[in-house]
Amino acid sequence: SDCQVSNIQVMQNFDRSRYTGRWYAVAKKDPVGLFLLDNVVAQFSVDGSGKVTATAQGRVIILNNWEMCANMFGTFEDTPDPAKFKMRYWGAAAYLQSGNDDHWVIDTDYDNYAIHYSCREVDLDGTCLDGYSFIFSRHPTGLRPEDQKIVTDKKKELCFLGKYRRVSHTGFCESS
C-alpha cells in the first residue's frame, strides 16, 4: 500500500441492512483530540427509506478527571460508493464533540468482524494526517482467530498497523 487515502479499498457490494445491529469495538486507532476510551459499543440502524443512523456509547474523561459514559448519535449521508458515508455526529451532552466525518467500511463479513476507517485530514502528500479507525466484533470477547489475519492485513493497507489499542469491555456504560 502507498498510504494514499484516495487508493484505500473499501468493502465491495456493501449491504447496509446486513451491517445493522450491535457491534463491539475491540480495537481503535485514535484521532487527535477527545475520543471514546473504552467500553465502545455501536448500534447501526436502517429506516424504511434506507437511511443509516447510529448510536454509540463509550467511556470518556472530561474536564481532566470526570469519568462518564458518553452517548453519541450519528446520521449517515450516502455517497456514490455504497461503503463510504458522510457521518454527522453529536453527543447527548453539549460538552461532547460534534462534527462531520467520513465513515468508510473497509471490510466486514457482517456476522463477526468489521473494519471502519475515517480520515479527518489528508496531508499534502495524499496520506492521512489525522484519522481514526475501529475494529468491530459482533462479540464483546473479541475477534475469532480466523478473522485476526484478515484484520491485520487491512490495518497494513490503512497504514495504521501498530497504531491500534485494545478496547476493553468492563460493563462501565451498563452500570451508569
Swiss-Prot record:
GO cellular component, one term: yolk
Modified residues (N-acetylserine): S1
Keyword Cell inner membrane: no
Highest taxon, organism lineage: Eukaryota
Keywords: Acetylation, Disulfide bond, Retinol-binding, Secreted, Transport
Keyword Flavoprotein: no
Disulphide bonds in the chain: C3-C159, C69-C173, C119-C128
Gene Ontology MF terms in the entry: retinol binding; retinol transmembrane transporter activity
Binding locations of substrate: Q97
Cross-referenced InterPro entries: Calycin, Lipocalin_ApoD, Lipocalin_CS, Lipocln_cytosolic_FA-bd_dom, Retinol-bd/Purpurin
Subcellular location: Secreted
PANTHER family: RETINOL-BINDING PROTEIN 4
Function text: RBP delivers retinol from the liver stores to the peripheral tissues. In plasma, the RBP-retinol complex interacts with transthyretin, this prevents its loss by filtration through the kidney glomeruli.
Family: Belongs to the calycin superfamily. Lipocalin family.
The name this protein goes by in its record: Retinol-binding protein 4-B
Organism of origin: Oncorhynchus mykiss (Rainbow trout)
Gene label: rbp4b
